[in-house]
C-alpha cells in the first residue's frame, strides 16, 4: 500500500523501487528518503530544507529510530503492517502523523528500509506547513518517546516468506 504526494513531488517512477524493497528485499515499510545519501531536494527554499532535515535529525535523536527521513510522505507499507498498527490510535493530525506511523511500525518491530529518492518541490500550490503543525511535531515526538517508555508494543507477526 503506497502513500505519496499527488503533486508529483514524489516521482511515480520510484514506486517500483519502494515496492521492490518490500516484495524482494524483506522490508515491511519502505521509505522514499530525501536524506539517506545527503540532501536530495530540488527547488525548496533553504529555510524549508533546514527545517525538514533538522526535524528528521531531532526525531532520530529523541526516539532512537534508525530512519534518516522521518517526515517522508513517500512510503510503501505491507498490508500486514497497517492491519497490525491500530490506525484508529494515530493521534497526530498534521505532518507529524508521518513520524508517528514510522515510529509505531519501528516499535512493533517491523523492518523499515529507506530507498534514496530525489524530492522535487511542487510547481503549483503551496505548503500547508504552519506553526501549529510544527509544534505538534516538536512536542509530539517527546510524547511518543515517553509513551514508548511506559507501554509495550505487540511484536510484529512473523513473515511467512522467510525474510
Q: Model-found features: residue ranges?
A:
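Acceptor/aglycone-binding surface of glycosyltransferases and processive sugar-polymer synthases
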Residues: 2, 12-95, 122-139
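The conserved acidic donor/metal-binding loop of glycosyltransferases
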Residues: 5-9
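Short, hydrophobic secondary-structure boundary micro-motifs
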Residues: 30, 69-70, 114, 150, ...
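Catalytic donor-sugar/metal-binding loop of nucleotide-sugar-dependent glycosyltransferases
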Residues: 66, 89-93, 102-119
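DNA-recognition element of transcription regulators
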Residues: 99
